[in-house]
Curated annotation (Swiss-Prot):
Its EC number is 2.4.2.17. InterPro entries: ATP-PRT_HisG_long (IPR020621), ATP_PRibTrfase_cat (IPR013820), ATP_PRibTrfase_CS (IPR018198), ATP_PRibTrfase_HisG (IPR001348), HisG_C (IPR013115), N-reg_PII-like_a/b (IPR011322), N-reg_PII/ATP_PRibTrfase_C (IPR015867). This is ATP phosphoribosyltransferase. The gene is hisG. Pathway: Amino-acid biosynthesis; L-histidine biosynthesis; L-histidine from 5-phospho-alpha-D-ribose 1-diphosphate: step 1/9. Belongs to the ATP phosphoribosyltransferase family. Long subfamily. It catalyses: 1-(5-phospho-beta-D-ribosyl)-ATP + diphosphate = 5-phospho-alpha-D-ribose 1-diphosphate + ATP. Keywords: Amino-acid biosynthesis, ATP-binding, Cytoplasm, Glycosyltransferase, Histidine biosynthesis, Magnesium, Metal-binding, Nucleotide-binding, Transferase. GO terms for molecular function: ATP binding; ATP phosphoribosyltransferase activity; magnesium ion binding. It is an enzyme of class 2 (transferase). Catalyzes the condensation of ATP and 5-phosphoribose 1-diphosphate to form N'-(5'-phosphoribosyl)-ATP (PR-ATP). Has a crucial role in the pathway because the rate of histidine biosynthesis seems to be controlled primarily by regulation of HisG enzymatic activity. Its cofactor is Mg(2+).
Length: 299
């Protein structure tokens, strides 16, 4: 019998989101020994258990209340949701937050020599996909009649194998499509990884753990999106320098020893600092510009 006060998190055992999910928990300070041959791993320093499962099992485990939380791609989540709605199965969940990894899109692609004007060009096509419900929802909204060919893997080879006229599959860079003589013609669904939670009663002890975890996740993601900036700036150009940098809070201004015309400025910037911005800072007389990564951040 498992401890009902320990929070159970389902995450992908192997695949696209696995390493990033593990990295997120590690950055949140959760000490856990994750061995791929085990179904469940236990955190040493927090009452958290991690279930390592197939990604398409995660939404169902959360919706059925088997686990408390799940880290899953929105594409997998929405596909399972549509399936459960069609079958009158339990389908309730709460999205706690979108995460900053697992970014991809579900797209329609056709052989490079297939004519294409707009979405109506796919009328009566046989389309291979691992996401039949998302595909149907999209094409139904466009009043496109089509035939679905369900494949659980290697969808991109379906046209060459004579199984389909087009495919609907996940795309990150498009390199796989190009390697198989395909071109992307329409985005069906854009996806990130997300953290989801079961609905229904969650006891106080678990809520405290979940709230603590959410605070840490927010801090980790905020830190990834931010940089710590240090520079020296002319006093008479200070406002212009500050206007170039979008800070989480107002900057810290310090006097420089033996220099009444320049100050040191420290701040957390909430935007990526591009070379162009650094060059503008330099043109305003800023010097000793340092841009540092932030490991952890709590506002």
């Amino acid at each position: 019998m498992f401890n009902t006060n320990r929070v159970r998190i389902a995450m992908q055992k192997t695949g696209r989101l696995s390493s990033e999910s593990i990295k997120l928990l590690t950055c949140c300070g959760i000490k856990i020994n994750l061995k791929q041959q085990k179904l469940i791993a236990f955190a040493e320093n927090m009452p958290i258990d991690v279930m390592l499962v197939r990604d398409d099992d995660i939404p169902g485990l959360v919706m059925d209340g088997v686990v408390d939380l799940g880290i899953v791609g929105e594409n997998v989540l929405q596909e399972e949701l549509l399936h459960r709605i069609s079958q009158n199965l339990e389908n309730s969940y709460i999205t706690l937050r979108r995460l900053d990894f697992g970014i991809c899109r579900l797209s329609l692609a056709i052989p490079i020599n297939t004519p294409y004007v707009d979405i109506t060009s796919l009328k009566n096509f046989r389309i291979a996909t691992s996401y039949p419900h998302l595909l149907k929802k999209y094409l139904d909204s466009k009043n496109i009649v089509f035939k679905s060919c369900m494949l659980n893997g290697s969808v991109e080879v379906a046209p060459r194998a004579g199984l389909a006229d087009a495919i609907c599959d996940l795309v990150s860079t498009g390199a796989t499509l190009e390697a198989n003589g395909l071109r992307e013609v329409q985005v069906v669904f854009r996806s990130h990884a997300c953290l989801i939670c079961k609905t229904g009663n969650i006891n106080f002890a678990k809520k405290e753990v979940i709230n603590k975890l959410m605070t840490r996740i927010k801090g980790v993601i905020k830190a990834r999106e931010s940089k710590y900036i240090m520079l020296h700036a002319p006093v008479n150009k200070l406002e212009e320098v500050i206007s170039l940098l979008h800070g989480a809070e107002k900057p810290t201004i310090l006097k420089l020893a033996g220099d009444d015309h320049r100050v040191a400025m420290h701040m957390v910037s909430s935007e990526t600092l591009f070379w162009e911005t650094m060059e503008k800072l330099k043109s305003l007389g800023a010097s000793s510009i340092l841009v540092l990564p932030i490991e952890k951040m709590m506002e």
